[in-house]
Swiss-Prot record:
This is Small ribosomal subunit protein uS4. GO terms for biological process: ribosomal small subunit biogenesis; translation. It comes from the Bacteria. It holds the Pfam family Ribosomal_S4. It comes from Brucella canis (strain ATCC 23365 / NCTC 10854 / RM-666).
Length: 205
């Protein structure tokens, strides 16, 4: 495993879960966290610890986004009508990097962030290089013409380990995806259990 891959799996090791469902994740082979003290037996988590872990897991899944950005997303979810946890999932899944990853244009969420930063993605015909760009229902995301033959794109399309969720329509021949609707928790194909209700409890303390 390269240093780059190892860094990406640090989140898996820290949480002790294979949060992206990747076959190469080191937690498939061991049940302890990173570092020399990782093998120590972990005690039962407090309520705060359980809530914190739920937050870390959700943050980690979307590329370990910053606390400032994650809290801002939570606060927006809390201001909206309806269930705050469901709103939070909908907002996270409407991020451009999440949709590029879900559409299988790239193999990982980290690759999606870099891919967008490097200017390989259009939204509604215009180049967007902001990872956290919020998509609206009906928005069309496309890999730019000059980028469609990049090895990382061709590799990602062939990945069998995950499917494109039904709230995104994808044409892999044209490398175009349409964001059809805002998903709820039950719609999102997470590889592990996500508990946004515990994230709400964490921020409501």
């Amino acid at each position: 495993m390269s240093k780059r891959e190892s860094a990406k799996y640090k989140i898996d090791r820290r949480l002790g879960e294979n949060i992206w469902g990747r076959p190469k994740s080191p937690v498939n082979r061991r049940e302890y966290g990173p570092g020399q003290h990782g093998q120590r037996r972990k005690g039962k988590l407090s309520d705060f610890g359980v809530q914190l872990r739920a937050k870390q897991k959700l943050k980690g899944f979307y590329g370990d986004i910053s606390e400032k950005q994650f809290r801002k997303t939570y606060e927006e979810a809390a201001r909206r009508k309806g269930d705050t946890g469901e709103n939070l999932i909908g907002l996270l899944e409407s991020r451009l990097d999440a949709v590029v990853y879900r559409a299988k244009f790239v193999p990982t969420i980290f690759a999606a962030r870099q891919f967008i930063n490097h200017g390989h993605v259009n939204v509604n015909g215009r180049r967007v290089n902001i990872q956290s760009y919020r998509l609206k229902v009906g928005d069309v995301v496309e890999v730019r013409e000059k980028s469609k033959q990049l090895a990382i794109v061709l590799e990602a399309v062939q990945l069998a380990e995950r499917d494109v969720p039904d709230y995104i329509d994808v044409d892999h021949n044209k490398m175009v995806a349409t964001y059809n609707r805002v998903p709820g928790l039950s719609d999102v194909p997470y590889a592990v259990q996500m508990e946004p209700n515990l994230v709400v409890e964490f921020y409501s303390r």
